[in-house]
Amino acid sequence: MFGLFGLWRTFDSVVFYLTLIVGLGGPVGNGLVLWNLGFRIKKGPFSIYLLHLAAADFLFLSCRVGFSVAQAALGAQDTLYFVLTFLWFAVGLWLLAAFSVERCLSDLFPACYQGCRPRHASAVLCALVWTPTLPAVPLPANACGLLRNSACPLVCPRYHVASVTWFLVLARVAWTAGVVLFVWVTCCSTRPRPRLYGIVLGALLLLFFCGLPSVFYWSLQPLLNFLLPVFSPLATLLACVNSSSKPLIYSGLGRQPGKREPLRSVLRRALGEGAELGARGQSLPMGLL
């Protein structure tokens, strides 16, 4: 019995410090992406999504690191920590779904997309993503007693079911758009495979393997804490990997082998020349994106 308890304590400590290490590196990478996309690269329709996605990941990782330090110092974890960190994770999920769907539509219907898409559609959609997500997480958390000591038995199930259903639908929409894009680019499209296509698929693979455990934990938190307590620290670690790895994907796809370049050039190449053309109001050459 004591051996199992000691083994669990060791495992929990190892995962905790791994999460802290990953979380410390993630804000640096996402901060560099934020700086370059926000101030050094002309904003195009897809770079705006990546800018907001980097902001959501930066906030998630910063909160995660701050709360981990507080947990280590105080020796206890408040449910408020999970609610606030999951809030920024949820914003990232919304943004990734919108980004994947728009990237898919731009490849399936390029002529219609270029002619009918409003110039500031990406900025408007990102603003619409942030606005409803901010209450979408705290409301069910408050009703179910995660933000206070008492729960509302009549209201909690309805809020929780609606929240869980919505997040699972978003994950499915993002993944479906990615699968359609993969099949189209691989089997049907005659144009060269774009780098931005790799960003979409890389982000969706991260979501599937590293992000969905957090959605499941949000959905089944009391049950998982009782039946599988190991799930919570692992889901937290994987969520940090999900948010920290996206800058590495951008860098890997945009960097030329054997050359040392500033991050601005790497990001511009990963996004494609169409990002700059779109920012000047010209038509988007979708084959370049």
From Swiss-Prot:
It comes from the Eukaryota. The keyword Membrane applies. It is a multi-pass membrane protein. One of its GO terms (biological process) is G protein-coupled receptor signaling pathway. Keywords: Cell membrane, G-protein coupled receptor, Membrane, Receptor, Transducer, Transmembrane, Transmembrane helix. Residues 1-13, 64-78, 142-163, 217-221 are extracellular. Its main location: membrane. One of its GO terms (cellular component) is plasma membrane. Belongs to the G-protein coupled receptor 1 family. Mas subfamily. Orphan receptor. May regulate nociceptor function and/or development, including the sensation or modulation of pain. This is Mas-related G-protein coupled receptor member G.
